[in-house]
Design a protein with these regions (language model features):
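Terminal, non-globular segments
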Residues: 1-170
């Protein structure tokens, strides 16, 4: 049990570091969504939701965001549960599809939200800048999610824990 808790802490820190690194280049990396999706498919929906909530809250506190993405996270869990039973987990190009979808939704959520919070005209982002952030975030997510799965699977396989790519259907 203690070993699994340590594993969860390691993958939580890994995902948050990935998000911070992508933020340095101007992309909103959907690391809490990726962690939630990974844990729901690999373990179960309770662990996935708890890990996603912790990652989301820590990410928002560290990055000083104005509001939360927890409502979107709640929508992600049924999708991940469906993917657990029906989705293909072994190919990176298939893994890039939910990655791009999560990146697009995460970036759009925060860009629109920040523009609403910064309502006075002088403080909002320009449309071109907003679109650039969403596009860059989607591309980073489509590339980053399969990479993150490979890294987290490597950590899990060293620890003899269940891995995403070898999880049997059902």
């Amino acid at each position: 049990m203690l070993f699994r808790i340590c594993w969860l802490i390691v993958i939580l820190v890994t995902t948050l570091v990935a998000e911070l690194l992508c933020c340095r280049v101007g992309a909103l990396f959907a690391a809490p969504f990726f962690l939630c999706f990974y844990l729901v498919v690999t373990c179960n929906w309770q662990i996935g939701l708890a890990g996603g909530i912790i990652a989301c809250v820590v990410s928002e506190v560290v990055l000083s965001r104005s509001f939360t993405a927890l409502p979107l996270l709640a929508l992600l869990v049924p999708f991940a549960h469906m993917w657990r039973h029906n989705g293909d987990r072994r190919h990176a190009y298939i893994q890039a599809l939910p990655g791009a979808l999560f990146g697009l939704s995460y970036a759009t959520w925060f860009v629109v939200g920040e523009n609403i919070v910064l309502w006075p005209l002088g403080f909002r982002m320009a449309v071109g800048e907003s679109v650039w952030i969403v596009v860059l975030s989607t591309v980073c997510a489509a590339i980053g999610f399969p990479l993150m799965i490979a890294i987290l699977d490597g950590i899990a396989s060293l620890a003899k824990l269940p891995v995403f790519c070898q999880r049997s259907v059902g």
